[in-house]
């Protein structure tokens, strides 16, 4: 069992908070930082710690979008009681989110041995970072960016939600990267693509976080580091979400494309030189 210090918990919480919702792969970043700090990345306590602090980032997106979430849930509840309310976009969108989550749940359960086994390799993470960069570049370049959030359809939700499977099977692809790229291919504007990515990710991230939490708490990572890391993750993730929405309103995704390639190359280098082990 590996003890994680308070200082290391702060660093890892910050890394998780920054990268969980940016299209850059939180998994790859956490593994790199853990390796550089001399923390054994395959230790049960470390794996458990990473799973728990993710809950802080999930809480951040729930708080940040709380008004939107309450509006959508309220519309859904009204629609269940009143047929006239079922024509409201928020009511339909609530069902779309539910339906769009089903594919990733089914694949996650069916492919769990692969996901926890060979597909968890850092070589896969590094390769997925670079391949995902190419997909993101192409999507941002060819997408027409003409459709807003109110123009989203059931088809959009299913395709974007289903694309989360890419990140599940190839973790370096990044859940945010996969969903945002898919939304851009569907001609959504960058802000709409980003917000849709957040909304469709909430059920999957929350479910996965709670599922991992029950096992992670028993790994012996330490209560104080867990609390600190989770709190830091929450604060940093909240700021990261706010920054990302402002950034994509004025910029392309090219900065993320270049950065992802650099991180992928760095990860290949660390693996090749033995600094990190897959």
From Swiss-Prot:
Keywords, ordered alphabetically: Antibiotic resistance, Cell membrane, Cell shape, Cell wall biogenesis/degradation, Hydrolase, Membrane, Peptidoglycan synthesis, Transmembrane, Transmembrane helix
EC class (word): hydrolase
GO CC annotations, alphabetized: plasma membrane
Entry membrane topology: Multi-pass membrane protein
GO molecular function terms listed in the Swiss-Prot or TrEMBL record: undecaprenyl-diphosphatase activity
Any Pfam family matching the protein: BacA
RNA-binding among keywords: no
InterPro entries assigned to the protein according to its UniProt record, in alphabetical order: UppP
Catalytic activity: di-trans,octa-cis-undecaprenyl diphosphate + H2O = di-trans,octa-cis-undecaprenyl phosphate + phosphate + H(+)
Membrane-spanning residues: 45-65, 95-115, 119-139, 191-211, 225-245, 256-276
EC number: 3.6.1.27
Localization terms from the record: Cell membrane
GO biological process, any: response to antibiotic
PANTHER family (UniProt xref): UNDECAPRENYL-DIPHOSPHATASE
Function: Catalyzes the dephosphorylation of undecaprenyl diphosphate (UPP). Confers resistance to bacitracin.
Family: Belongs to the UppP family.
Protein name: Undecaprenyl-diphosphatase 1
Originating organism: Streptomyces coelicolor (strain ATCC BAA-471 / A3(2) / M145)
